């Protein structure tokens, strides 16, 4: 396999092969062997039996990200890092980083000391760096060149493949989104500073201590001014007078870090003999670990788990509105969702399922880097009153308006499609053998964008949704070119040049029909319908507007050519058709030859100007006549006069095709989508406004006279998840199957199991009413059947009735579409979260739309679906577990419903019908109590 390369400015350094960068289970054992057998590893092994000696090297990453253009060698600025300033990588991640480091140790150390020297040149460099740091926050956005550099970097994968480590720069950077660089530190020497934790020492001091250790400086001990019999080693660090003291023999040596009395010992906290040192990592021996230590331990365990279990399912998280705001961060939202799903999976899934598959959630940021030209104009028009509130609306609600605009819709669709393909190719580059599934999680507007992209994977070109509205008001107009023939979408910007040949083709429909597909894909005009307009005067109002725009555009273009003197003989070839057959100069133009054209340019320009003036006069006559006709037709007075009286329509030539025949060009995704999750989605109202139903195009009779357009997303399954109080969410099932309109959405199980008390009571009442109605219907059917048998003289009527019943049992078109979208005969699309027992609907509606990222019920529902095809154990059959309230593994303490003994301090304990054992026990006790005299 080809070696990967890491770009280091202008210099390239060969990296290890991709299989060496994977933290797979089979790779970890190999990494351990590589580390043990590596020649560079031998010098880091323990050479003594002292308690202060060890060989365990651990890698750390800084909690605070580096500033832009800040070198890693400049931090930390202390000789011992502070507590909680650096976090440890997991054991397996550290092994992978150390193995890669040892393979290129000499080169990496050389580059590191060179960078350290650049940081130590003097105060001049510090002033420049400070000036840069001051200028950086004033910039509106991060430089695009920085992102280009980030794209080229490939390092050692850590933390489940979401981050990578660049050993040359000592950076830890995110892989799938643009984020900050974090300082990476190699912990070989550690110090105990006032507590029980061993904190790492920066590499600059650690390397000096390592040289002293290999030389066994404790053998050259002498009496120090303090009276201590030790060997002193002066160190170069951030503190003046920094030195180390080594005492003891070979197997009992100890070391302390200290500074001279003239130094800043009071600032850095040196007391007595100094800070105790040790070589090699040692864990904490605190009997009561703090919350920070517990979180660190949990994160290390999760990183080790991610390095062992392969990714079998990839989920792209597409955000909705609001990501343009300063406080909005999709990466943090997806990070919270990832932590919640990991905790729920540990409690609700079996060990076999957890060890077989891992789900990777990757954020898809399509709005951060997207700059729309209309945003600047909106900012200029924004009033000063309640400025903050208006800015909040501009960062949230305006995204919906931009997407509904025919001008910016294409840019938004391109941003989402390109981002999805970019993320997938990034993942595939690092996992070339990936054969798992891929799903899309779309929140809010992101679900609408994802749906539109999935619906146009086979037909990549589609009219803008507003085009159907135009056809509704102008049914007699010829439809725009079919998407299959449209090679590219119509531009949303006015054209600066109008070619004479194109103008000639637009005025001659016969020439257009003889052209190739490229010519057919050009923008249609109403001039092609000249004959139809003559037969039906009522259509003049629709055609003359575009005619005016085209004629005015041609006139302006002629003026442009006249003033620039750019017209040549190629502009009007021999035998070319005249612009208008009634023009007085038509016969003259046909009789011209090349010599006369080249010699009489001025005369030809004059004739063209006369022709333009005559055309303008004819247009004015048509406008006046058309205005008289429109005054008699009341049906079109609400639409046509606004366009006829607007002179800007005549001058802005590109507005007509952009407003009425816009086309959206969709990019084909590089992957197949397994499941599409629409969460908190307004998709239902978008489809209703477009008059779209979900189908395969054969439901005309099913939808009767609704004249609906049908489309089907390219995915195996689709789910619509929403909170009942979310003001943005809408149902989807009524647009798929009419019979599902009275059906309630499926209740998503509570993450502790079952349904809440009020939900259970409500379902009990509805189920009781439904069953009672079915019983009554059954009695009515039996009575009708008995009466029919008694009244009939033969069994023919009975056979006919049975055939009629069989016909009634046939499934409808909508139910077939439900099965196509869900994968099961009785599947459902709409799934509703349970509201809390005591909460106000209107107060809950404020945060219901943004709470999906932190909702445990939503996370558990998605996790159960993604693991649905995995059996509970190696020999267990595969079962679907969606919405199942039964425990999956009775031998595990963390089952689906057994949650009473769990500790949930951060959440209220609601009343549910989930614990069947407690319910039975309570019923038994109640019966015993009632039996007592």
UniProtKB/Swiss-Prot annotation:
This is Phospholipase SGR2. Its EC number is 3.1.1.-. The keyword Secreted does not apply. The active site is at 444. It is an enzyme of class 3 (hydrolase). Residues 1-14, 553-563, 885-902 have a biased composition (Basic and acidic residues). It is found in: Vacuole membrane. InterPro entries: AB_hydrolase_fold (IPR029058), DDHD_dom (IPR004177). Forms oligomers. Residues 1-22, 475-517, 553-598, 871-903 are annotated as: Disordered. It comes from Arabidopsis thaliana (Mouse-ear cress). Residues 593-631 form a coiled coil. Pfam families: DDHD (PF02862). PANTHER family: LD21067P, PA-PL1 PHOSPHOLIPASE FAMILY. The gene is SGR2. The keyword Lipid metabolism applies. Residues 669-868 form the DDHD domain.
């Amino acid at each position: 396999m080809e070696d990967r390369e890491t770009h280091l400015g202008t210099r390239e350094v060969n990296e290890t092969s991709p299989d060496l960068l994977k933290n797979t289970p089979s790779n970890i054992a190999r990494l351990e062997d590589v580390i043990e057998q590596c020649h560079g590893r031998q010098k880091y092994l323990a050479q003594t039996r002292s308690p202060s000696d060890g060989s365990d090297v651990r890698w750390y990453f800084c909690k605070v990200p580096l500033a832009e253009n800040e070198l890693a060698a400049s931090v930390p600025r202390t000789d011992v890092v502070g507590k909680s300033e650096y976090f440890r990588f997991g054991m397996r991640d550290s092994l992978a980083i150390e193995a890669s480091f040892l393979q290129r140790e000499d080169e990496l150390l050389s580059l590191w000391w060179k960078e350290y020297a650049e940081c130590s040149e003097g105060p001049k460099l510090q002033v420049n760096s400070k000036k840069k740091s001051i200028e950086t926050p004033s910039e509106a956005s991060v430089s695009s060149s920085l992102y280009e550099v980030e794209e080229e970097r490939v390092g050692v994968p850590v933390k489940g493949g979401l981050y990578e480590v660049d050993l040359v720069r000592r950076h830890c950077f995110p892989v799938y989104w643009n984020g900050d660089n974090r300082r990476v530190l190699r912990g070989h020497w550690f110090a105990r500073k006032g507590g029980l934790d061993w904190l790492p020492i920066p590499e600059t001091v650690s390397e000096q201590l390592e040289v002293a250790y290999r030389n066994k400086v404790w053998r050259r001990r002498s009496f120090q001014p303090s009276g201590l019999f030790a060997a002193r080693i002066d160190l170069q660090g951030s503190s003046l007078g920094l030195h180390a003291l080594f005492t003891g023999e070979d197997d009992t040596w100890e070391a302390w870090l200290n500074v001279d009395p003239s130094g800043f010992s009071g600032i850095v906290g040196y007391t007595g003999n100094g800070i105790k040192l040790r070589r090699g990592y040692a864990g904490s021996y605190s009997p009561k670990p703090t919350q920070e230590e517990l979180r660190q331990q949990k994160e290390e365990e999760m990183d080790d788990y991610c390095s062992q279990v392969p990714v079998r399912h990839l989920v792209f998280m597409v955000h909705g509105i609001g990501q343009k705001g300063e406080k909005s961060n999709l990466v943090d939202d997806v990070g919270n969702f990832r932590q919640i799903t990991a905790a729920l999976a540990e409690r609700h899934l079996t060990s076999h399922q957890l060890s077989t598959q891992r789900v990777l959630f990757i954020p898809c940021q399509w709005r951060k880097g997207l700059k729309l030209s209309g945003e600047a104009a909106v900012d200029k028009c924004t009033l000063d009153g309640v400025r903050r509130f208006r800015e909040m609306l501009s960062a949230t609600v305006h995204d919906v308006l931009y997407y509904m605009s025919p001008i910016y819709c294409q840019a938004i669709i391109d941003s989402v499609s390109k981002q999805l393909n970019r993320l997938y190719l990034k993942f595939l580059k690092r996992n070339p053998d990936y054969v798992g599934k891929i799903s899309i999680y779309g929140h809010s507007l992101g679900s609408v964008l994802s749906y539109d992209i999935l619906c146009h994977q086979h037909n990549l070109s589609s009219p803008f949704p507003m085009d159907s509205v135009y056809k509704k008001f102008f049914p007699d107009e010829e439809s725009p070119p079919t998407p299959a023939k449209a090679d590219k979408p119509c531009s949303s910007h006015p054209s600066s040049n109008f070619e004479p040949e194109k103008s000639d083709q637009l005025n001659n429909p016969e020439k257009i029909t003889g052209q190739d597909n490229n010519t057919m894909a050009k923008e249609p005009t109403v001039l092609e319908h000249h004959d139809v307009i003559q037969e039906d005067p009522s259509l003049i109002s629709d055609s003359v507007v575009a005619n005016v725009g085209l004629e005015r555009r041609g006139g302006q273009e002629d003026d442009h050519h006249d003033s620039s003197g750019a017209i040549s003989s190629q502009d009007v070839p021999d035998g070319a058709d005249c612009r208008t057959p009634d023009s007085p100069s038509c016969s003259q133009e046909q009789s011209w030859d090349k010599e006369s054209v080249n010699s009489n340019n001025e005369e030809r320009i004059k004739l063209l100007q006369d022709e333009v003036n005559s055309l303008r006069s004819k247009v004015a006559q048509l406008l006046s006549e058309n205005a008289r006709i429109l005054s008699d037709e009341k049906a079109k007075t609400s639409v046509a006069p606004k366009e006829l009286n607007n002179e800007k329509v005549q001058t802005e030539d590109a507005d007509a095709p952009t407003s009425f025949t816009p086309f959206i060009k969709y990019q084909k995704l590089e992957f197949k989508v397994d499941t599409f999750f629409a969460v908190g989605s307004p998709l239902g109202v978008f489809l209703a406004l477009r008059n779209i139903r979900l189908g395969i195009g054969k439901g005309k009779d099913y939808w009767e006279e609704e004249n609906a357009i049908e489309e089907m997303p390219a995915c195996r399954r689709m789910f619509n998840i929403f909170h009942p109080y979310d003001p943005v969410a809408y149902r989807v099932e009524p647009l798929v199957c009419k019979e599902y309109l009275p059906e309630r959405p499926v209740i998503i199980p509570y993450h502790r199991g079952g349904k809440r008390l009020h939900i259970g009571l409500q379902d009990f009442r509805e189920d009781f009413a439904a069953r009672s109605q079915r019983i009554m219907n059954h009695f009515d059917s039996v009575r009708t059947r008995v009466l029919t048998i008694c009244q009939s003289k033969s069994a023919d009527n009975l056979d006919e009735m049975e055939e009629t019943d069989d016909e009634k049992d046939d499934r409808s078109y909508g139910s077939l579409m439900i099965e196509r979208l869900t994968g099961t005969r009785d599947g459902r699309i709409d799934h509703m979260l349970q509201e809390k027992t005591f909460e106000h609907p209107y107060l809950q509606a404020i945060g219901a739309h943004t709470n999906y990222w932190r909702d445990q019920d939503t996370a558990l529902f998605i996790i159960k679906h993604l693991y649905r095809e995995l059996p509970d154990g190696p020999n267990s059959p595969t079962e679907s577990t969606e919405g199942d309230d039964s425990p999956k593994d009775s031998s595990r303490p963390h089952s689906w419903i057994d949650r009473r003994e769990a500790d949930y301090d951060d959440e209220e304990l609601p009343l549910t019908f989930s614990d069947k054992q407690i319910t039975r026990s309570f019923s038994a006790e109640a019966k015993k109590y009632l039996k007592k005299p």
